[in-house]
């Protein structure tokens, strides 16, 4: 029984972390059709922002939940203004540019921080489930993911910003004709996507550690999740994370981490074969 | 001068330069340069395989390294079991081609297209990476070849003169072989693209629906293109395993896959010479950035100049912004505008660019 | 000799070069020494300290008047964690730079890429990393420790302290696989039991399910042979689950990548490790070495690692052999090394073991204590017994392979 509860928590955690690392990419890709290969590095920067802030005496909660998203969001806006905005409509070129950006950011962080960076350890301690102990921080990550997704839902569904965003996403020309200023929407979107990635990177930093090349561990997985989810940002990310996260974690628990990883990837292939437009191409079509 | 003549002149030029390169490099350069050029030639064949699939076939394949790696692994495993290189070489082409055919059938007949193709191919290569990576234990072997996991397979025997296993091909021989293979691939693809088949796949790339309504089955043509590309990549993988006598799972990794795409973008999609130039240029740059590092400096400048990813990243970003079409098409444009200032008929060439190169 | 254009160009270039150098202060050209390490990409955490140590060793040699009256010049290659570049740079070092020796390679994979290239082009090779053992090649010298030298000591020490039931977690590659087999062997020999061995690919960061499995198995301690940046998250998640207090841990891989500095004291204090070198070793040679290292690279240098010391000692051994041979000629230096050359290094006495080309050296058990490594016990002059069981280059000088040692 206690094992079942523990496993359930771990499956939820896997889903939550997958959703967290993917949602920033989903917004950038879903709204702008930009394949951001520097996504992993945005997550990495979030981790560094949190570390630097805590080492300057800022509370770890503020560092993770406020400082990291703001810093990475601003970096995102700068990147959009200096590089990405010249490349709209050229999906392939953004791939090359963001790959370059990813190398650049790895090089820059190595130059600034070296490669031995003191990390932050997970706060909140641990708790007992029957015979097992597990980290209370796991529950915190799950909560953060739930809150982030809920906020995105509210913003998209009921605010003017959300309306404009959905409009631009569905038909940028039409939105433009109706008086929306697409460049501004794009800059804000890119910044928001980056900020969410920064938040995710910071929240996961105490679990996964922070080093300059950690981005590689994230980028492929979040990319696969986003595409597997399909066009709708929110329901796509949630449904794909739920599917891949639980498959991955259960397979890992029953067999080995390698098999868990392979099971996730294989599930992605089968999913796309069955639903060539991703999950939300078929289900939840009216979702966000 | 008309388009056809210009095209032939270009083709002739490539041939002359290629043959001159083939003959002259080993005479004028030290062995280390010859060896370096050898790997550039091999990678250029890999670049051409994606140039065909993506640049002409319009299939965004993010996992070309899967076929490259399969070729290398197949050769290595077959070589340890057979000991004579003719069959391993053939297998190293056939296995990746068959794999590409299966995967292609799975994708194209499932009507998967666009970015979803990219994700599936990426996922496939990552599965191969993860699987091969976890074969470190002694229980993982195929015949007498141990798979070796992360460490890969070292000490792969080189190709030999067909039929005579006591006559291995030496280092200069490998250079001749790789360069000749690259030239053959280039001209072979030019022929293929000039044929009816080539026209049809470019037509499908331009407008799949229209091609379908005209009675061509895009799925079959894409499948064929994909399989040819897989075979070429496998062949390059076999040569690569020969060059370093070594193969490891990183050959399937994300960095390797992205690299191939970057060669093609940098050189120019929709050309054949472009990806070759892009590949050699990027490879050369990576090597040059890693060579002769300043050591032990703790000041800022040393940190920046010794920082290969930093510099490489800046160059790539600058490149996208300044040379958006890729190297060869941009040079082509410059050349044409020079020509246009002399004769007006050059202007009519513009729309045809997609088929040249 | 057949004179063709290439040899002609070569000889004219040589004449020109000779002309250029005759005006310099040194009687002859410098001796080229190549370093081939990952200085960027995922493995730079290991490579950078190694190159720093090599730089210092060479600068010291030059300050003392060079070798054989010639300056030593470091040619430093960054392989960017890319295997293809290992091949290319090994070729360049041997053929273009014509180096007297190559120091380099971090993972066993990179060593097996370099080794045949340098064999082919007859260039001496030093591999300075701790590894799984078993390489037998007359052209190569190995200055790192192998499992028989460290695991053999640490297993009984940890079992005496904590108990007999051991759970092993290891990186899923050659080194992790072989090391965990050695752990199993010594645990069994000491009357204990290995309850499970779990392997993790080097990029795994989620250890939640594994931690639950370990809790279910209830071992007396955990043995970690985890490697690299991603695996640091195991220690984090272990501590976050509150396990550090109830189940202790021992390792022969921890701290090589400065894990004890990256993690907080709460996450790793009390862990036992075993290596050849620790920065806090108390002996005069080490104290003066640490002082000059800090003078050169700054006192805020995080930690002088095991691998850095291996590289430093590797260069010193080679330099000693060059002096003895009176030449940088490859065969003469190999023969000089095979006389069993030894040096007084910061880690203690280090001697080349002629039949295996590995080193006889001191090992120490230490405990992680507040970002430092506190030495608990010393074992003098450990032989590379694992490799010695399969390799004898005095009897079979032409042997050239990596043995899989039967455990």
Residue ranges and their predicted role:
Chain A
Residues 112, 170-184, 255-288:
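Cytosolic-side transmembrane-helix boundaries in multi-pass membrane proteins
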Residues 59-70, 187-197, 201-202, 207-269:
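Transmembrane alpha-helical segments in multi-pass inner-membrane proteins
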Residues 14-15, 133-211, 234-239:
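Helix-loop-helix "hairpin" substructures at the membrane interface of multi-pass membrane proteins
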Residues 41-45, 87-110, 215-227, 255-275:
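Pore- or pathway-lining transmembrane helices of multi-pass membrane proteins that form conduits
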Residues 99, 103-130, 253-260, 280-288:
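Extracellular/periplasmic helix-loop junction at the C-terminal end of a transmembrane helix
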């Amino acid at each position: 029984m206690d094992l079942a509860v523990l496993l359930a928590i771990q499956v939820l955690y896997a889903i939550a972390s997958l959703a967290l690392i993917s949602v920033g990419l989903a917004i950038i890709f879903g709204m702008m059709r930009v394949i951001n290969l520097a996504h992993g590095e945005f997550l990495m920067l979030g981790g560094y922002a949190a570390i630097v802030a805590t080492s300057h005496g800022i509370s770890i909660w503020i560092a993770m939940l406020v400082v990291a998203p703001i810093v990475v969001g601003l970096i995102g806006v700068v990147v959009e203004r200096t590089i990405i905005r010249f490349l709209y409509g050229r999906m392939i070129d953004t791939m090359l540019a963001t790959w370059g950006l990813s190398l650049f950011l790895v090089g820059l962080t190595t130059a600034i921080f070296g490669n031995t960076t003191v990390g932050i350890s997970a706060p909140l301690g641990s708790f007992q489930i029957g015979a097992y102990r597990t980290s209370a921080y796991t529950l915190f990550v799950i909560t953060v993911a739930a809150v982030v997704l809920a906020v995105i839902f509210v913003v998209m569904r009921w605010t003017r910003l959300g309306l404009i965003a959905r409009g631009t996403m569905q038909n940028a020309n039409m939105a433009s004709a109706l008086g929306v200023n697409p460049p501004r929407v794009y800059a804000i979107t890119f910044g928001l996507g980056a900020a969410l990635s920064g938040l995710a990177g910071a929240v996961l930093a105490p679990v996964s550690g922070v080093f300059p090349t950690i981005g590689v561990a994230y980028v492929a997985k979040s990319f696969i999740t986003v595409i597997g989810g399909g066009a709708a940002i929110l329901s796509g990310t949630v449904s794909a994370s739920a599917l891949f996260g639980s498959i991955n974690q259960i397979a890992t628990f029953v067999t080995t981490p390698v098999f868990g990883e392979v099971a996730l990837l294989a599930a992605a292939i089968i999913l796309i074969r069955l639903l060539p437009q991703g999950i939300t191409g078929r289900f939840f079509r009216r979702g966000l | 001068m008309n388009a056809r003549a210009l095209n032939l002149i270009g083709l002739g030029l490539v041939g002359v330069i290629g043959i001159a390169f083939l003959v002259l490099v080993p005479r004028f350069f030290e062995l280390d340069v010859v060896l370096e050029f050898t790997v550039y030639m091999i990678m250029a064949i890999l670049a051409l395989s994606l140039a065909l699939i993506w640049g002409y076939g319009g299939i965004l394949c993010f996992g070309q390294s899967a076929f490259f790696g399969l070729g290398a692994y197949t050769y290595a495993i077959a070589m340890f079991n057979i000991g004579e290189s003719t069959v391993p070489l053939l297998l190293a082409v056939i296995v990746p081609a068959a794999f590409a055919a299966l995967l292609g059938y799975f994708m194209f007949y499932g009507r998967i297209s666009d970015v979803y193709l990219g994700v599936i191919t990426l996922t496939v290569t990552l599965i191969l990476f993860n699987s091969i990576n976890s074969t470190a234990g002694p229980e993982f072997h195929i015949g007498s070849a141990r798979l070796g996991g992360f460490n890969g397979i070292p000490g792969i025997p080189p190709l030999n003169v067909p039929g005579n296993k006591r006559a291995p091909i030496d280092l200069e021989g490998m250079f001749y072989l790789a360069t000749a293979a690259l030239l053959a691939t280039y001209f072979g693809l030019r022929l293929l693209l000039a044929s009816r088949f080539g026209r049809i796949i470019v037509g499908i790339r331009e407008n799949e629906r229209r091609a379908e309504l005209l009675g061509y089955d895009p799925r079959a043509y894409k499948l064929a293109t994909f399989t040819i590309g897989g075979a070429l990549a496998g062949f390059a993988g076999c040569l690569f395993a020969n060059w370093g006598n070594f193969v490891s799972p990183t050959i399937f990794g994300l960095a390797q896959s992205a690299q191939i795409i970057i060669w093609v973008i940098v050189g120019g999609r929709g050309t054949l010479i472009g990806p070759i130039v892009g590949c050699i240029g990027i490879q050369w740059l990576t090597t040059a950035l890693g060579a002769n590092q300043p050591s032990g400096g703790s000041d800022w400048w040393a940190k920046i100049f010794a920082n290969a990813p930093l510099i490489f990243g800046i160059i790539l970003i600058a490149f996208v912004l300044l040379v958006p079409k890729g190297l060869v098409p941009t040079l082509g444009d410059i050349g044409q505008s020079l020509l246009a200032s002399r004769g007006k008929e050059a202007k009519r060439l513009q729309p045809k660019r997609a088929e040249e190169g | 000799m057949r004179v063709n254009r290439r040899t002609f160009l070569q000889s004219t270039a040589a004449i020109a070069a000779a002309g250029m150098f005759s005006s310099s202060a040194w009687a002859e050209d410098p001796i080229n020494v190549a370093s081939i390490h990952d200085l960027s990409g995922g493995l730079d955490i290991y490579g950078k300290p190694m190159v720093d140590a090599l730089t210092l060793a060479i600068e010291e040699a030059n300050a003392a008047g060079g070798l054989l009256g010639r300056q030593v010049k470091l040619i430093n290659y960054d392989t960017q964690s890319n295997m293809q570049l290992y091949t290319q740079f090994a070729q360049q070092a041997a053929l273009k730079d014509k180096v007297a020796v190559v120091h380099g390679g971090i993972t066993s994979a990179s060593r097996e890429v370099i080794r045949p290239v340098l064999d082919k082009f007859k260039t001496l090779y030093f591999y300075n990393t701790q590894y799984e053992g078993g390489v037998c090649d007359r052209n190569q010298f190995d200055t790192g420790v192998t499992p028989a030298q460290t695991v053999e000591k640490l297993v009984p020490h940890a079992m005496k302290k904590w108990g007999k039931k051991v759970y092993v977690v290891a990186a899923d590659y050659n080194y992790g696989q072989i090391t965990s087999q050695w752990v199993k062997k010594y645990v069994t020999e000491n009357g204990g039991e290995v309850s499970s061995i779990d392997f993790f690919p080097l990029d795994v960061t989620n250890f939640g399910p594994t931690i639950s499995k370990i809790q279910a198995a209830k071992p007396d301690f955990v043995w970690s042979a985890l490697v690299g940046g991603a695996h640091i998250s195991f220690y984090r998640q272990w501590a976050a689950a509150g396990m550090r207090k109830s189940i202790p841990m021992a390792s022969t891989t921890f701290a090589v990548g400065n894990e004890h500095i990256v993690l907080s004291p709460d996450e790793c204090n009390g862990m036992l490790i075993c290596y050849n070198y620790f920065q806090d070793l108390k002996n005069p040679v080490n104290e003066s070495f640490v002082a000059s290292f800090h003078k050169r690279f700054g006192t805020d240098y995080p930690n002088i690692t095991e691998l850095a010391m291996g590289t430093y000692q590797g260069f010193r051994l080679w330099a000693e052999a060059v002096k003895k041979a009176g030449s940088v000629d490859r065969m003469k230096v190999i023969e000089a090394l095979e006389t069993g050359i030894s040096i007084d290094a910061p880690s203690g006495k280090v001697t080349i073991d002629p039949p295996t080309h590995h080193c006889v050296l001191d090992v120490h058990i230490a405990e992680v204590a507040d970002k430092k490594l506190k030495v608990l016990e010393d074992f003098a002059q450990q032989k590379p017994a694992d490799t010695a069981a399969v390799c004898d280059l005095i009897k079979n000088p032409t042997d050239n392979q990596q043995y899989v040692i039967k455990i």
